[in-house]
């Protein structure tokens, strides 16, 4: 069955994703996202979008870097040749 994924960045803990409009204390870490990516490898992911990045709320830039890593991981999942 085809899967379209909307990934909300406020799922991450504010310690690694402060640049979101609705931070979630006690949120998840990168390793948790990596585990989801591993599960998705065996499913039919046909598209994805990433939401809730607000770079103005993060003067360190770490949120934009993490968002780019998430997008890269999802693109790699969508690339059936990889």
Predicted segments, located by residue:
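Catalytic cores of soluble, metal-dependent hydrolases
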Residues: 1-82
